């Protein structure tokens, strides 16, 4: 006769998110001791997680939250889109995000050590990975804490949770334009805020490339400086947010749009699942 009750099974399932039969079997093995059953399930989960260690995590979701003058963006990765849209995985992302926000973490390392109930975030993820049967990883964390923040989460498929997430740090009062800039970032994928933020070695590498291309095209030597600068301007439009043509009106640059709205963009973060 089993020396545990249905309430014990429910408690175990609630605490670890384990399946019904896994919970029952663990309680049988633990002779009804819930704490021992938890350790049994965790040990089995760790063994399974170790086997999954080298697997790719190209699916998942992004999630974000704004609280106490700061916005936090995370990417939680898994192996398949089947798990990415699973309610347990989505609930895990919510728990992870809440713990990361509460801890004020701004890096993956800090986030993994953040308290999550009686566990750390790292342990919580490990437990849920064992239940879901896939490798799960907290891939990225960003925290912005300027004057104001705007969050935009984009679904690339109606069947999946958000796959692209953006947080914009800004000063000013035009929240509508700030949200539009966040949407632009999701679409245009800038790497830097301004041209001055692009590393010098990257600019010089691009300069060398466009110089060689221009010479190979047989451009007159006297015209090369102007041609090269023009092509570098195109490069800056690709990588620097403020230099880009505004997605909603390509006759204006993002810089002109934010200036007209009385905004100053002070930073941003953009995560795309698997990218």
UniProtKB/Swiss-Prot annotation:
Protein biosynthesis as a keyword of this entry, yes or no, is yes
**Region called Involved in Mg(2+) ion dislocation from EF-Tu, residue ranges:** 80-83
- SS bond list: none
**Per the record, GO CC terms?**
cytoplasm
- Cite the CDD domains for this sequence: UBA_EF-Ts
Q: Would the keyword Isomerase turn up in this protein's UniProt record?
A: no
InterPro entries linked: EF-Ts_dimer_sf (IPR036402), Transl_elong_EFTs/EF1B (IPR001816), Transl_elong_EFTs/EF1B_dimer (IPR014039), UBA-like_sf (IPR009060)
Q: Which Gene3D superfamilies match?
A: 1.10.286.20, DNA helicase RuvA subunit, C-terminal domain, Elongation factor Ts, dimerisation domain
List the coiled-coil residues: none
Which GO molecular function entries does the Swiss-Prot or TrEMBL record give? translation elongation factor activity
Q: What does the UniProt keyword field contain?
A: Cytoplasm, Elongation factor, Protein biosynthesis
Q: Where in the cell is it found?
A: Cytoplasm
Q: What function does this protein fulfil?
A: Associates with the EF-Tu.GDP complex and induces the exchange of GDP to GTP. It remains bound to the aminoacyl-tRNA.EF-Tu.GTP complex up to the GTP hydrolysis stage on the ribosome.
Name the family: Belongs to the EF-Ts family.
Give the PANTHER family listed for this entry.
ELONGATION FACTOR TS, ELONGATION FACTOR TS, MITOCHONDRIAL
For this entry, the protein name equals: Elongation factor Ts
| Gene source species | Clavibacter sepedonicus
């Amino acid at each position: 006769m089993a020396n545990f009750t249905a309430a014990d099974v429910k408690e175990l399932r609630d605490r670890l998110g384990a399946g019904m039969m896994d919970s029952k079997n663990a309680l049988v093995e633990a002779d009804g001791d819930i704490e021992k059953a938890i350790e049994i399930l965790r040990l089995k989960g760790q063994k399974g997680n170790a086997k999954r260690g080298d697997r790719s995590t190209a699916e998942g979701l992004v999630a974000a939250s704004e609280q106490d003058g700061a916005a936090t963006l995370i990417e939680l990765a898994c192996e398949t889109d089947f798990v990415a849209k699973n309610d347990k995985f989505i609930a895990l992302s919510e728990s992870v995000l809440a713990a990361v926000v509460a801890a004020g973490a701004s890096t993956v390392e800090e986030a993994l050590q953040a308290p999550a109930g009686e566990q750390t975030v790292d342990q919580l993820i490990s437990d849920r990975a064992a239940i879901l049967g896939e490798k799960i990883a907290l891939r990225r964390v960003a925290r912005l804490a300027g004057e104001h923040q705007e969050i935009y989460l984009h679904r690339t498929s109606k069947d999946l949770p958000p796959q692209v997430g953006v947080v914009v740090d800004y000063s000013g009062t035009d929240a509508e334009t700030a949200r539009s800039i966040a949407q632009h970032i999701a679409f245009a994928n800038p790497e830097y805020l301004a041209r001055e933020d692009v590393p010098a070695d990257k600019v010089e590498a691009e300069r060398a490339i466009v110089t060689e291309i221009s010479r190979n095209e047989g451009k007159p030597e006297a015209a090369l400086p102007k041609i090269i600068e023009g092509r570098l301007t195109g490069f800056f439009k690709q990588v620097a947010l403020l230099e880009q043509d505004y997605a909603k009106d390509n006759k204006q640059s993002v810089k002109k749009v934010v200036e007209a709205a009385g905004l100053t963009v002070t930073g941003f973060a953009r995560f795309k699942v698997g990218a």
